[in-house]
C-alpha cells in the first residue's frame, strides 16, 4: 500500500486533503474555509514574529510597536500584515457564515460543525479585541475600558469581576500583560477549534453543496481538483491583502490609535474596529446595560438556533424564494447595524438601531421558522396532486 | 417586490384553504405553523415592509453624517488636496522632504519635539552622511556614567535621536501657557484627515477671528482645530525660511513641504512599502493567472464531460 494510505499520520492528511472526495458541484463559495485557515496561519506567523519585538508594558508597549515599525527589518510589513489580515479574517468569516446561512449548512447532520463554528466566531472576536489593546494607543486603552466595563453589568458581582479582569482599579499594566498572554494563547485554541470544526464535518457527511441534496452522486478527489480551485482564491486574497498592506495599510484603522494611550484624556468617540460594529450597535440599542450586554452576546449565540428554527424540508434557500428575500433582508440589516455602530448615539440612529436589532433577532426566532413553514406548505401543495 | 411577485404566482385562496386542512400532516415539526401558514399575504406584506425599511434606512444612513458635536467643536473639515506623494505609484519628493526638514528645524522645532526620528534615518533620504554627522554634533547628549559615576556631555552621533526642545512635559507646558505642543513624529497618522488636516491648520489662520467668534486669552482662532481655539499661533509667513535650493518660501510652499516631511517622519517606510507593493502585485497577478490556467486545465475534462443515462435493457 502507498505510504500515504498506511502511515498513521499521512493517512489523515490523505483523507482530509488528498483523496478526500468532495461534491463536484460545490461553487467558489466553498473556498472560504481554506482562506480562513490561511488567515489563521498568517496571523500566527506574523503574531509570533511581532511578539519577539513587543514589550507588554504600559510604558513601553506603544514605543515597542513604533520600534517594530521603524527599526526592525521589514517590521512594518509584519505589523501591517497582522493588522490587515485581522480585518480580512473577519470579512471572510462573515462571508463563510453567510454561505452557511444561505445553503443551510447548519442543518442536521452538520449541527456540530455549525456549533463549533459559532464558538470559533466568539473566540475570534475575543482574540481580535485583546490584540487591539496591545499597541496601547488611545483607542486601545479606551476600547479596553469600555468593553471590560460591560462585565460590571452582571448583578451583585459585576464590579468585582471587572476588577478581577483588570487586576487593579482601572486598565493598567497587569491588564495589558494578561491581555498579551491571552492574545498569544487564543490563536492556538482557535487552531484546535478549527481542527474540531473540520473533523466534525469530515466524519459526518463532508461538505454540503449548492443544490442541498446528497453529494454522493458525483464526487471528485480533493487533489488536484479542489487544491487548484482553492489556490485561485488564495491568490485573489493575497492580491487584495497586498493592496491594503502596501498601499493603504491604515485605511481600516482609527488614527486615534497612533496617539499614545492617555488615561487622563478620553477621545471624542470610542469606536471599535469595523468588524465588531454590528454587535456594538446591538449593545447600544438596548437602554438597559445588563440587557444590552445579554443582547450583544445573544446576537452571536443566535446563530446556534438556526438548526432548530429552520423547519424547512429543503436544505438551503436556493429553491425557496421567500427565504431568499428574508436572507437578503438579514444581510442588509447586518450592514445597517454596522453603520449604526459607528454613529454617535443620537436620534435617529438610536431608533434605527432598535428597529434593526429587533429585525436581527426576529430573523432567527420568527422569520426563519415562519417562512420555512409557509414554504413547506407551498412545496407540499405543489407536489401533491 | 420580489416576494410579492413570487407569491402572486401561487393561487392564494386555494393555498390558504388547503393549507388549513393539511396542517396536521404538514407541520408536524411545529405547532406554530397553523396560523402563520394560513395568511401568507400578511407575511408578504411584512417582508416587503421589512425590505423597504432595511433598504430605506441603509440609504438614509449612508447618505448623511452625524455630528455629536457642533461644527465648531468638530472643527472645519479640511480640503482634500491632491498630494503627489499619497498616490499609489509615487514616492516622497525628497527635495521637498529636505525643505520640509529645514522648515521643521527653523520654525517648528522651537516648540515641537520629533523624538522618534534619529539622525541616522535622514542619511540617504534627504542628506548625506557627512551632513547628518555635522548636524548631530551640533547637539549635546548625556554620556553613560563614567568610572566616578559622573554623567558628562558629548557631541551627538548619528544613532542619537533629535533632541526635544523641552526637558519634560511640565517645562513644555510652562513655556506655552499651559498647552503641550504635541510630538510630531506620528502627527500625520495620529490625526483625522492626516496631511490635509495639518496643511489646513497651518495655512488656515485668518487675520482676525470672524465676527461672533470668541477666543480666550492667549489662544488663537483656527477653524480647522477641533474647538477652534488653539494655543499655537500662526507660525508660517512668507519668507520666514530661506530655502537653500532657492525655492520661493511662500506660506503654502512651506506648509506643503513640512507636511510632506512630517508624513515621512510618520511613515519612513512608505517608499519601500510602495515599491515592494508593486513587486508583490505584479508577482501575485502572474501567479493568479497561472493558477486560473491550471485550475481550468485540471477541470476541463470534468466541465466538458457528458453524462448519459442508459436505461436498463432487458436481455431475454
Swiss-Prot record, chain A:
GO terms for molecular function: metal ion binding; ubiquinol-cytochrome-c reductase activity. GO terms for cellular component: mitochondrial inner membrane; respiratory chain complex III. GO terms for biological process: mitochondrial electron transport, ubiquinol to cytochrome c. The keyword Transport applies. A ubiquinone binds at residue 202. The keyword Plastid does not apply. Binds 2 heme b groups non-covalently. Heme b b566 binds at residues 96, 197. It is a multi-pass membrane protein. InterPro entries: Cyt_b/b6_C (IPR005798), Cyt_b/b6_C_sf (IPR036150), Cyt_b/b6_N (IPR005797), Cytb/b6-like_sf (IPR027387), Cytochrome_b (IPR030689), Cytochrome_b_C_euk/bac (IPR048260), Cytochrome_b_N_euk/bac (IPR048259), Di-haem_cyt_TM (IPR016174). It is found in: Mitochondrion inner membrane. Its cofactor is heme b. Heme b b562 binds at residues 82, 183. The chain crosses the membrane at residues 32-52, 76-98, 113-133, 179-199, 226-246, 290-310, 322-342, 349-369. Keywords: Electron transport, Heme, Iron, Membrane, Metal-binding, Mitochondrion, Mitochondrion inner membrane, Respiratory chain, Transmembrane, Transmembrane helix, Transport, Ubiquinone. Belongs to the cytochrome b family. Fungal cytochrome b-c1 complex contains 10 subunits; 3 respiratory subunits, 2 core proteins and 5 low-molecular weight proteins. Cytochrome b-c1 complex is a homodimer. Heme 1 (or BL or b562) is low-potential and absorbs at about 562 nm, and heme 2 (or BH or b566) is high-potential and absorbs at about 566 nm. Component of the ubiquinol-cytochrome c reductase complex (complex III or cytochrome b-c1 complex) that is part of the mitochondrial respiratory chain. The b-c1 complex mediates electron transfer from ubiquinol to cytochrome c. Contributes to the generation of a proton gradient across the mitochondrial membrane that is then used for ATP synthesis. This is Cytochrome b. It comes from Aspergillus tubingensis. The lineage of its organism: Eukaryota, Fungi, Dikarya, Ascomycota, Pezizomycotina. The gene is cob.
Amino acid at each position: 500500500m502507498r505510504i500515504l494510505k498506511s502511515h498513521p499520520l499521512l493517512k489523515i492528511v490523505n483523507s482530509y486533503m488528498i483523496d478526500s472526495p468532495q461534491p463536484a458541484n460545490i461553487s467558489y463559495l466553498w473556498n472560504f474555509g481554506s482562506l480562513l485557515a490561511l488567515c489563521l496561519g498568517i496571523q500566527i506567523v506574523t503574531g509570533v514574529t511581532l511578539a519577539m519585538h513587543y514589550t507588554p508594558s504600559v510604558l513601553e508597549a506603544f514605543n515597542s510597536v513604533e520600534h517594530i515599525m521603524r527599526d526592525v527589518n521589514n517590521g512594518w510589513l509584519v505589523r501591517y500584515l497582522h493588522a490587515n489580515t485581522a480585518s480580512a479574517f473577519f470579512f471572510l468569516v462573515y462571508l463563510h457564515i453567510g454561505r452557511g446561512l444561505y445553503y443551510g449548512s447548519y442543518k442536521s447532520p452538520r449541527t456540530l460543525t455549525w456549533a463549533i463554528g459559532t464558538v470559533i466566531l466568539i473566540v475570534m472576536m475575543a482574540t481580535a479585541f485583546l490584540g487591539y489593546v496591545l499597541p496601547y494607543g488611545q483607542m486601545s486603552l479606551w476600547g479596553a475600558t469600555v468593553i471590560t466595563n460591560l462585565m460590571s453589568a452582571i448583578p451583585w458581582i459585576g464590579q468585582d469581576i471587572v476588577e478581577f479582569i483588570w487586576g487593579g482599579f482601572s486598565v493598567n499594566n497587569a491588564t495589558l500583560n494578561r491581555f498579551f498572554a491571552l492574545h498569544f494563547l487564543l490563536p492556538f485554541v482557535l487552531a484546535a477549534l478549527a481542527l474540531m470544526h473540520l473533523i466534525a464535518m469530515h466524519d459526518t457527511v463532508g461538505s454540503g453543496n449548492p443544490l442541498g441534496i446528497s453529494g454522493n452522486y458525483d464526487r471528485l478527489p480533493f487533489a488536484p481538483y479542489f487544491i487548484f480551485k482553492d489556490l485561485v482564491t488564495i491568490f485573489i486574497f493575497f492580491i487584495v491583502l497586498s493592496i491594503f498592506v502596501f498601499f493603504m495599510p491604515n485605511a481600516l484603522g482609527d488614527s486615534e490609535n497612533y496617539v499614545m494611550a492617555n488615561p487622563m484624556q478620553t477621545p471624542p468617540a470610542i469606536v471599535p474596529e469595523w468588524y465588531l460594529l454590528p454587535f456594538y450597535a446591538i449593545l447600544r440599542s438596548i437602554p438597559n446595560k445588563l440587557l444590552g450586554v445579554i443582547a450583544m452576546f445573544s446576537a452571536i449565540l443566535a446563530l446556534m438556533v438556526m438548526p432548530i428554527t429552520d423547519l424547512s424540508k429543503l436544505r438551503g434557500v436556493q429553491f425557496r424564494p421567500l427565504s431568499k428575500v428574508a436572507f437578503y433582508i438579514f444581510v442588509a440589516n447586518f450592514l445597517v447595524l454596522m453603520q449604526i455602530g459607528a454613529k454617535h448615539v443620537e436620534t435617529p440612529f438610536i431608533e434605527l438601531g432598535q428597529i434593526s436589532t429587533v429585525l436581527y433577532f426576529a430573523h432567527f426566532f420568527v422569520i426563519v421558522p415562519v417562512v420555512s413553514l409557509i414554504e413547506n406548505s407551498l412545496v407540499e401543495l405543489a407536489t401533491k396532486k | 417586490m420580489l416576494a410579492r411577485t413570487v407569491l402572486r404566482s401561487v393561487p392564494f385562496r386555494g393555498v390558504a384553504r388547503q393549507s388549513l386542512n393539511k396542517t396536521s400532516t404538514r407541520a408536524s415539526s411545529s405547532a406554530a405553523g397553523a396560523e402563520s401558514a394560513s395568511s401568507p399575504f400578511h407575511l408578504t406584506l411584512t417582508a416587503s415592509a421589512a425590505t423597504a425599511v432595511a433598504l430605506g434606512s441603509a440609504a438614509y444612513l449612508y447618505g448623511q453624517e452625524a455630528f455629536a458635536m457642533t461644527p465648531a467643536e468638530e472643527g472645519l473639515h479640511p480640503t482634500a488636496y491632491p498630494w503627489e506623494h499619497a498616490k499609489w505609484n509615487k514616492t516622497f519628493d525628497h527635495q521637498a522632504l529636505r525643505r520640509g526638514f529645514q522648515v521643521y528645524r527653523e520654525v517648528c522645532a522651537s516648540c515641537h519635539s520629533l523624538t522618534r526620528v534619529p539622525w541616522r534615518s535622514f542619511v540617504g533620504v534627504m542628506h548625506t552622511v557627512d551632513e547628518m554627522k555635522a548636524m548631530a554634533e551640533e547637539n549635546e547628549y548625556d554620556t553613560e556614567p563614567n568610572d566616578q559615576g559622573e554623567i558628562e556631555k558629548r557631541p551627538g552621533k548619528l544613532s542619537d535621536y533629535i533632541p526635544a526642545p523641552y526637558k519634560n512635559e511640565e517645562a513644555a507646558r510652562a513655556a506655552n501657557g499651559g498647552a503641550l505642543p504635541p510630538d510630531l513624529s506620528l502627527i500625520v497618522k495620529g490625526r483625522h484627515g492626516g496631511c490635509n488636516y495639518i496643511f489646513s491648520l497651518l495655512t488656515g489662520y485668518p487675520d482676525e477671528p470672524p465676527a461672533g467668534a470668541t477666543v480666550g486669552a492667549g489662544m488663537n482662532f483656527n477653524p480647522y482645530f477641533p474647538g477652534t481655539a488653539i494655543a499655537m499661533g500662526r507660525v508660517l509667513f512668507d519668507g520666514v525660511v530661506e530655502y537653500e535650493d532657492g525655492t520661493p518660501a511662500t506660506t503654502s510652499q512651506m506648509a506643503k513641504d513640512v507636511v510632506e516631511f512630517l508624513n515621512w517622519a510618520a511613515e519612513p517606510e512608505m517608499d519601500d512599502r510602495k515599491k515592494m507593493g508593486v513587486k508583490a502585485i505584479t508577482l501575485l497577478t502572474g501567479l493568479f493567472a497561472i493558477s486560473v490556467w491550471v485550475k481550468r486545465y485540471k477541470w476541463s475534462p470534468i466541465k466538458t464531460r457528458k453524462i448519459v443515462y442508459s436505461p436498463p435493457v432487458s436481455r431475454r
